């Protein structure tokens, strides 16, 4: 038991290495830019991007991943019955009985209720178990080693802003240092130890800029589609089958799902995402017969989008029958 505990502690310690590396690079970039270059015109923009970058990075790292609430845990009697039962079919019947009162619309690939034996909870839609954090995370996107944290419902907006401001930070440094970088190679830069900071500052900023740009673009595309990284690779399965666009509500509504309704808060690393992370509006055209209609929309109201599409589909079928 003791060696396992020591190993686990070592793994947790090593997991902070990428975060410490980024922190050291940022601290050095601050010294190289502010102390060695120290141009007043640049410092205002630099500090603005620096503060927003550090703020969003901090929020991404230290915002605790959201977990399923107690209502998704099996009641004591059903839990005992589930653990005693050996047959998967009977276990599924127990889960289905409990799930009827929950806002669940996604299933496993085999059409079963998604249950985490590790956390002993019925998984809400878009929830997945993270082996690194050893917990189920609401609307899990991925586990990021660069923040040593799971990126999910509670901090996905912060992660997007972290990518945004880190890209702005690197672009600004690379652009403003470029002239000194050129002077370095043309031997026009005065001889001092600062010239080496200029050289490496440009290389590091350009390198991070290129790597962040692709990740930033990809996650903007995911936000526009209202998908997580996991859902992009494996489409969520509904009762009618897999649907990669199952949670897509249209571009503007998809953006609001992550950033909220009030645009004045979009660029600030404060939580404004819609919903509670336990249930999500969908673009389903048919209502799940096994779920109560009041669960279709977080807050107890049926999604207007679902009603319109459902009624339209019903009227179209009736018209076709009359003809």
Swiss-Prot record:
Keywords: Acyltransferase, Cell membrane, Cytoplasm, Endoplasmic reticulum, Golgi apparatus, Lipoprotein, Membrane, Metal-binding, Palmitate, Phosphoprotein, Transferase, Transmembrane, Transmembrane helix, Zinc. The active site is at 144 (s-palmitoyl cysteine intermediate). It comes from the Eukaryota. The keyword Metal-binding applies. The chain crosses the membrane at residues 15-35, 42-62, 158-178, 196-219. Residues 36-41, 179-195 are lumenal. Residues 1-14, 63-157, 220-323 are cytoplasmic. GO terms for cellular component: endoplasmic reticulum membrane; endoplasmic reticulum-Golgi intermediate compartment membrane; Golgi membrane; perinuclear region of cytoplasm; plasma membrane. GO terms for molecular function: metal ion binding; protein-cysteine S-myristoyltransferase activity; protein-cysteine S-palmitoyltransferase activity; protein-cysteine S-stearoyltransferase activity. It catalyses: L-cysteinyl-[protein] + hexadecanoyl-CoA = S-hexadecanoyl-L-cysteinyl-[protein] + CoA; L-cysteinyl-[protein] + tetradecanoyl-CoA = S-tetradecanoyl-L-cysteinyl-[protein] + CoA; L-cysteinyl-[protein] + octadecanoyl-CoA = S-octadecanoyl-L-cysteinyl-[protein] + CoA. The keyword Translocase does not apply. Belongs to the DHHC palmitoyltransferase family. This is Palmitoyltransferase ZDHHC20-B. It comes from Danio rerio. The gene is zdhhc20b.
């Amino acid at each position: 038991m003791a060696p396992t505990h020591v190993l686990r502690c070592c793994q947790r310690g090593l997991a902070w290495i990428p975060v410490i590396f980024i922190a050291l690079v940022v601290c050095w970039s601050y010294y190289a830019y502010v102390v060695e270059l120290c141009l007043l015109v640049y410092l205002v923009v630099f500090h603005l991007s620096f503060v927003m970058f550090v703020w969003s990075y901090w929020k991404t790292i230290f915002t605790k991943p959201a977990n399923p609430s107690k209502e998704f845990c099996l009641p004591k009697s059903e839990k005992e019955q589930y653990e005693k039962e050996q047959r998967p079919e009977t276990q599924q019947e127990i889960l289905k009985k409990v799930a009827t009162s929950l806002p669940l619309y996604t299933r496993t690939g085999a059409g079963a209720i998604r249950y985490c034996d590790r956390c002993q909870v019925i998984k809400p839609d878009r929830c997945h178990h993270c082996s690194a954090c050893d917990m189920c995370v609401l609307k899990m996107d991925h586990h990021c080693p660069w923040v040593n944290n799971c990126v999910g419902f509670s901090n996905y907006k912060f992660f997007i802003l972290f990518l945004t401001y880190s890209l702005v930070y690197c672009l600004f440094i690379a652009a403003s240092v470029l002239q000194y970088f050129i002077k370095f190679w043309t031997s026009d830069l005065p001889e001092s130890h600062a010239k080496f900071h200029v050289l490496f500052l440009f290389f590091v900023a350009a390198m991070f800029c290129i790597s962040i740009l692709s990740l930033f673009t990809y996650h903007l595309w995911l936000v526009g589609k209202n998908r997580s990284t996991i859902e992009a690779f494996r489409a969520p399965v509904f009762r009618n089958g897999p649907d990669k666009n199952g949670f897509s509500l249209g571009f503007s509504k998809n953006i609001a799902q992550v950033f909220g309704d009030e645009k004045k808060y979009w660029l600030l690393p404060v939580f404004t995402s819609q919903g509670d992370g336990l249930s999500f509006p969908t673009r389903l055209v048919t209502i799940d017969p096994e779920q109560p209609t009041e669960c279709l929309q977080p807050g107890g109201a049926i999604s207007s989008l679902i009603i319109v599409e459902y009624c339209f589909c019903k009227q179209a079928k009736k018209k076709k029958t009359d003809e």
